[in-house]
Structures are given as C-alpha cells and as structure tokens.
Amino acid sequence: MQGSVQIQKGNISSSYTPEKHPSHPTSANGSMSPKRICELRKEDPSSLHKQLLKNSLEKGTEHCDRTTKTYGQIFQLFCLCCAGAAPFYRARAFRLQSTFLIYTLHCSSDSVSTSTHYFRRLYSRRW
C-alpha cells in the first residue's frame, strides 16, 4: 500500500489537499491532465468509471474532493462535478478483501436520500 491514503479506525485521513495539488498530471492510461482533478490513489476502477471520468473531462469537468463520514468501509469520497446541467457522478473507494475498488454512484447534487438509494444498490454489485 502506497502511503498517500491512510485508513484509521473511526476516522478518515488523507494526505491529499486540493490546494497543494490543483492538477492531476497523469492517470493509469496517461491521458488525465485537466486543471482541477481529484487524485484517485490506489485505484482499480471499473471500465464504466473510466468512461464516465473520460466523458466528464471532455465536457470541462469541475472537480471537487470531499472527505465524508465513514459509511461501512468508505474512506474517501470523490465527486465528479460535470459542467452545466450534466449529471453528477460520484465514486466511492472501498477497501474490500485487501483490494481497492472504485464504485460509481449516480445521484442528484442535492438529494442525500437519492444518493444513499443509488449507493446501496451499487454497493452490492461487483464489477
């Protein structure tokens, strides 16, 4: 496990700070270089998530990186905020059976209940 993300019992800890890292120069395929990109460390994303990320970046993505309360084994919340009226896609990173997986959540920006509903549905899926 590389040292950029640490998981502590009952807490969320990350060395990532958006102010110090305004851009993400590269990704697994070397194509990610927009202004404000969340660093997705220790990622093993599904092809769906890769496609959503690619589409978002092509539309001039505004990225926000938030830490969220622990929900099961969630340790960080990545929010892909598409420009204009495009839908929101959120990826939640899980540490399951010593493997880091990215699960993608499609939800509205202002509905916690909708977010939770979609999250619970996708949580049970293994890609």
UniProtKB/Swiss-Prot annotation:
Tree of life domain: Bacteria
Annotated stretches, region: Disordered: 1-36
Amino acid composition bias (Polar residues), ranges on this chain: 1-17
The protein, known as: Uncharacterized protein TP_0355
